[in-house]
């Protein structure tokens, strides 16, 4: 434990608050606490946290990132892809029973280091990602050091009681309620997420919706106007992502489109079952499971594909939809998820009812046979991202909110 404290103390001071090469010194210094952040070996993990930070300095905000990981998990290493971040490992109880008190353990690991950092380089605000454990630790730090804090809510389970059951789940819910009530603002990535927070908070919560963004330069349209004949999905291979539904829909559609194939980027516990399903549906030869890929590989695949489909039934927003839209592709997504606040059906994307096989078959059939419609939707999708969902847009919204909270 002493070695951990010494190491993390050194890391925090080594990071400091870097002002980069620009001459204009930002007026505001923000400490970001996050359980997910990109590394050189996994540049997709937490990209939705890292990418807006690159634009924050333009809006007078400088961020110091502390990415955290429990001691009992495999270390992510120290290969953060940006010099403003360091990984810190903290002790906690493994399993669901350990999630509720994890923020207190994290606070205990951080308080002395953050206090010294605050004394030497004033921290104006703490921004935590997810209520547990980072939000809880941020609220405790906020109270101890008299620094305002905000918490971003990234998913549709803001109280963690859907993923953790029984007594432990109820404990998680109560701690999360405390976090949302105590934070200066609960930042929600969609209105749907905000509604879930308000419905479950059991007391007034100050929420603000700030949508995630997309790096529109990385996820740019293809130079060539001759895409490959593939339908693409990007997502973990877990039931809620809808890969099974899409395989069954493609089994019905592909006989009418003999040149079309299906590519899936992602990995997870459903891999073997989905592979067997593709074989059972007699489309195994036209389905490629590509596994995890880098951000560049994902962007290249999106540029190459004919259209993007992910009939996920449980998405707070879904950054992959914005990324595909930014590459000028028609996107198929589900109603009732965060993305339907951005997609206008038939205009800049295509929406189906969750779990509706016939709806998905119809959507695929319409879009695969209509080049002009795909092109119109893709162009509108790209305009949508450029007009409202770039990293600069998100950074500007965050900077405005930060200043409201410290005023």
Each model region followed by its residue ranges:
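Conserved acidic donor-binding segment of nucleotide-sugar-dependent glycosyltransferases
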Residues: 344-346, 350-357, 366-371
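Short hydrophobic beta-strand element within catalytic cores of glycosyltransferases
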Residues: 330-333, 343
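Short alpha-helical donor nucleotide-sugar binding micro-motif in glycosyltransferases
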Residues: 180, 292-293, 300-305
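Aromatic "clamp/platform" in nucleotide-sugar-dependent glycosyltransferases that forms part
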Residues: 313
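N-terminal subdomain of nucleotide-sugar transferases
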Residues: 2-4, 8-77
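Conserved donor-binding/catalytic core segment of Leloir-type glycosyltransferases
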Residues: 31, 223-250, 263
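Nucleotide-sugar donor phosphate/pyrophosphate-binding loop at the beta->alpha transition
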Residues: 44-47, 147-150, 158-178, 216
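Carbohydrate-associated surface elements
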Residues: 69, 192, 213
């Amino acid at each position: 434990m002493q070695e951990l404290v010494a190491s993390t103390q050194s890391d925090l001071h080594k990071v400091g608050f870097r002002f980069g090469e620009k001459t204009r010194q930002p007026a505001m210094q923000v400490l970001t606490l996050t359980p997910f952040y990109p590394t050189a070996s996994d540049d997709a993990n937490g990209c939705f946290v890292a990418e807006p930070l690159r634009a924050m300095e333009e809006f007078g905000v400088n961020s110091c990132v502390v990415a955290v990981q429990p001691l009992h998990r495999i270390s992510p290493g120290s290969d953060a892809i940006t010099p403003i971040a360091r990984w810190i490992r903290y002790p906690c109880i493994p399993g669901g029973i350990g999630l509720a008190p994890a923020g207190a353990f994290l606070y205990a690991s951080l308080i002395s280091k953050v206090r010294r950092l605050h004394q030497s380089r004033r921290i104006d605000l703490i921004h935590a990602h997810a209520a547990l454990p980072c939000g809880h630790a941020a609220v405790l730090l906020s109270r101890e050091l008299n620094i305002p804090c905000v918490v971003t809510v990234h998913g549709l389970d803001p109280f963690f009681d859907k993923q953790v059951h029984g007594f432990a789940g109820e404990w998680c819910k109560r701690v999360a309620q405390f976090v949302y009530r105590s934070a200066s603002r609960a930042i929600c990535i969609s209105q749907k997420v905000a509604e879930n927070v308000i419905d479950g908070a059991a007391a007034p919560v100050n929420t603000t919706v700030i949508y995630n963004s997309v790096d529109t330069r990385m996820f740019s349209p293809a130079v060539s106007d001759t895409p490959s004949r593939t339908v693409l999905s990007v997502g973990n291979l877990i039931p809620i992502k809808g890969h099974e539904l899409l395989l069954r829909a493609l089994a019905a559609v592909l006989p009418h489109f003999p040149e079309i194939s299906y590519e899936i980027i992602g990995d997870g516990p459903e891999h073997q079952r989905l592979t067997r399903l593709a074989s059972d549906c007699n489309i195994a030869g036209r389905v490629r499971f590509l596994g995890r890929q880098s951000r560049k590989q994902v962007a290249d695949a999106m540029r190459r594909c004919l259209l993007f489909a992910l009939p996920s039934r449980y998405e707070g927003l879904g950054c992959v939809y914005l990324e595909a839209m930014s590459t000028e592709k028609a996107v198929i997504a589900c109603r009732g998820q965060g993305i339907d606040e951005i997609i206008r059906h038939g205009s800049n994307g295509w929406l189906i009812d969750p779990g509706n096989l016939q709806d998905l078959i119809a959507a695929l059939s319409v879009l695969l046979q209509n080049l002009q419609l795909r092109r119109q939707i893709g162009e509108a999708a790209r305009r949508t991202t450029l007009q409202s969902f770039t990293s600069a847009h998100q950074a500007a919204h965050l900077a405005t909110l930060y200043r409201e909270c410290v005023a």
